[in-house]
Regions:
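The catalytic "switch" region of P-loop NTPases
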Residues: 1-72, 115
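Winged-helix-like regulatory helical subdomains adjacent to P-loop NTPase cores
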Residues: 74-80, 84-169
Length: 170
């Protein structure tokens, strides 16, 4: 959403708000369309949406490694899966993630974006998304930053990997 719909100043525009949500598939197709346009290839959104995600990912091979060589659950997974797991169904998250990684690749003179480039920018990306969340919900939850930082796993939980397991059980 471009504006917070529950903000105290939105009563003047709430009748004009256009509700739109993205799927990760649409966001991946959007990235592929941008890459294809950069290389002078005209693909329509309709054409791209019809393709499977692995098929879409092949278009990205000219700008980033196809396999992300991370650790744990991210060990040798398709790069597009790593990207989709981080973007919260928000196109601007994907733009930010890819822009940071591309700048890192340029700085290190890499021909394409690699696992190393993504790993180098994850902390900056995460801090930015945390700040986005704080800014987005501050008017509704004034203490949102303390709440979010309080959810951070402890050192012991990190070592045991318990801090990253969330269930719906009470």
């Amino acid at each position: 959403y471009l504006v917070r719909t529950s903000d105290e100043s939105t009563d003047k525009i709430e009748g004009s708000v256009i509700w739109y949500s993205w799927t990760n598939h649409e966001i991946l197709a959007l990235l592929v369309k941008r890459v294809e346009q950069f290389f002078g290839n005209a693909k329509t959104t309709g054409e791209l949406i019809k393709l499977s995600q692995p098929s879409l990912a092949q278009f990205l091979d000219q700008v980033m490694e196809s396999v992300f060589s991370g650790h744990g659950n991210w060990a040798r997974i398709p790069t597009y899966r790593m990207l989709m797991s981080l973007v919260r169904k928000r196109p601007r998250d994907l733009v930010k993630l890819c822009t940071l990684a591309a700048r890192n690749a340029r700085t290190t003179n890499d021909a394409i974006i690699s696992t190393k480039n993504f790993n180098s920018i994850f902390e900056e990306y995460s801090q930015g998304r945390l700040q986005d969340t704080v800014n987005e919900y501050r008017s509704e939850l004034p203490d949102i930053e303390r709440l979010l930082l309080g959810m951070k796993p402890s050192r012991e939980e990190k070592r045991a990997k318990l801090g990253y397991v969330y269930t719906t059980e009470s």
